[in-house]
Amino acid sequence: MQSLARLSRTSLVQKGLVPQTIKNYSSVSQAEIDNEPRFLECFKTFFDKAAGLTNLKPGVLNNMKECNVALRVEFPIKNEHGDVDIIAGYRAQHSHHRLPCKGGIRFSEEVDLQEVMALASLMTYKCAVVDVPFGGAKGGVRIDPKKYTVAQREKITRAYTLLLCQKNFIGPGVDVPAPDMGTGEQEMAWIRDTYQAFNTNDVDSMACVTGKPISSGGIRGRTEATGLGVFYGIREFLSYEEVLKKTGLTPGIKGKSIVIQGFGNVGYFAAKFFEQAGAKVIAVAEHNGAVYNADGLNIDALNKYKLQHGTFIDFPGATNIVDSVKALEIPCDILIPAALEKQIHIGNVADIQAKLIGEAANGPMTPRADQILLNRGHVIIPDLLLNAGGVTVSYFEWLKNLSHVRFGRLNKKWEESSKKLLLEFVESTVNKKLSEAERSLIIHGADEIDIVRSGLEDTMQNACAETRKTANEKNTDYRSAALYNAIMKIKAVYESSGNVFS
């Protein structure tokens, strides 16, 4: 089995993976890399750049930029050794211009207050970009979930939820969490159950959290929503003439080479949808290794291998990349960072070879790296636009919970009956009968997942078109254009509410 351990520039050139003409940034010191701003400051830098395109007063912009309120809590949990761990939890609500606030909860040892404030800020503008009527929020619990048993994770989740209830930081009309890194359907079900236990008279209590299992009031299509939104967004941008001209790519997904960093919920489903559309996913990276195959990886086989072995290393037919971050530097048509923030920075930006970068993760690029790539002519589809599929479908789930009926239940059969009558009329008119398979395809009424995916596709297309229009009108990059649109939408809410801004 080949190994590209550390993937030095020399070895990359020798293997033909990196052109020799790319400028060498090996002189960048570790101190300079470490000196890049923290996540919250990165977001504020991007915000300030977009704010410069507006004519709003500094005080108005500062109010929009700063986080409204943040909560830090601590609570004890007995571990498997009988000792007591003190667990830190956080929840930040960036903006109350619309309620409820919305944002995920992550379980990670890296969670701190500035991170959740940054993510909450990003959520406000992400919601505005895709016209989801929420303010931004984010939460986290500072643990490594792999170090705790299922029973202990349940205790931690319920204790954290109880504190959110006590502080009025959760509720269908107040603040609605969702899954994030280290959490999933099960944690959301525990949150829903805990909230309902303390709010027995709230008929809409099911809407206190999204990303739940179907049996607990979830919605079909939520699990893959972010990855599918990434697919829809990149597909849309690959139909824009100016993007094709700048990147030298051809229209559509088929035949494109793709590198994905991160193989969690977002990365896996993004990879699946691109593979189904005819793209070649040539490399996939996780924290403990990456694999590369120029002819494309089999995503289902790769996922099965990872579940069995806990790593991609030694996946049959692929080349190992031990230092997984180096996978970002492999030449490809499309690079999709779908892992953590600040993965593309001053230390590795010179080696990024992708023509188009789609930010499936939150904040995967620092401002300096962003500007360098823009100057070099790369196309960057920003996180607040591209990974908004999750919050879009969370919005649909919230609406479902408030209406107390699944999408499609009231109209599916009526649609099928109407289509059947129309089809029979057409068949009798043209004197031709369709096959049963053709009839079933045409007559089929929309199920919940059909409605969800249709709504997500329409949302992503509209948001991409709005971003493109502003970028062309303002002669700016897509991140600044998306943020500009969000800022102006939030300003309109404040003005129509009779706020002092007006």
UniProtKB/Swiss-Prot annotation:
Coiled coil: none annotated. It is an enzyme of class 1 (oxidoreductase). NAD(+) binds at residues 96-98, 131. It comes from the Eukaryota. The active site is at residue 138. InterPro entries: Aminoacid_DH-like_N_sf, Glu/Leu/Phe/Val/Trp_DH, Glu/Leu/Phe/Val/Trp_DH_C, Glu/Leu/Phe/Val/Trp_DH_dimer, Glu/Leu/Phe/Val_DH_AS, Glu_DH, NAD(P)-bd_dom_sf, NAD_bind_Glu_DH. Optimum pH is 7.25 to 7.5. ADP can occupy the NADH binding site and activate the enzyme. This is Glutamate dehydrogenase, mitochondrial.
